[in-house]
Amino acid sequence: RTPLPTATHEPTRTALPTRTATTTLSPPFVLDKQIQVCNPNLNEPQIQIFLNDGAGLGVPGVQIILTWDDGQESIFTGLKPDIDLGYADFVMTPEIVYTLQVSGGGQIISDLFAPECEDEGSGRYWGSWRLIFKHP
């Protein structure tokens, strides 16, 4: 009798593990400019916030947290696209001091309060702040 041929086994290839993408936390927004706004046409004192990306375009949907002695409020950019996609504003109560932080560990801006402005025609009134943040 003739022996049956023995099967030779080819070595099987073991797939290399696939690399999983690691998310890199992007750096937080940093304050680029803080401008006092004295405009008698604004009916109430505001904190006007602009968040821009590296190309200078507004970034919508970013949470901004404002705190004061007995309160806190969150606002979001992008709700007033007619002004700018990266724009948000908050109405200040005169003589209250606010602290602002862009979510995600951004720079803390403290001691924000309605500045006093004066206009020859309309006298004294409460001013506003314009804060422009950039994403490095």
Question: Which positions does each model-derived feature cover?
Answer:
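Exposed beta-strand and adjacent loop surfaces of beta-rich binding modules
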Residues: 44-46, 61-63, 97-99
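Short, ordered, surface-exposed loop/turn motifs in non-cytosolic proteins
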Residues: 56-73
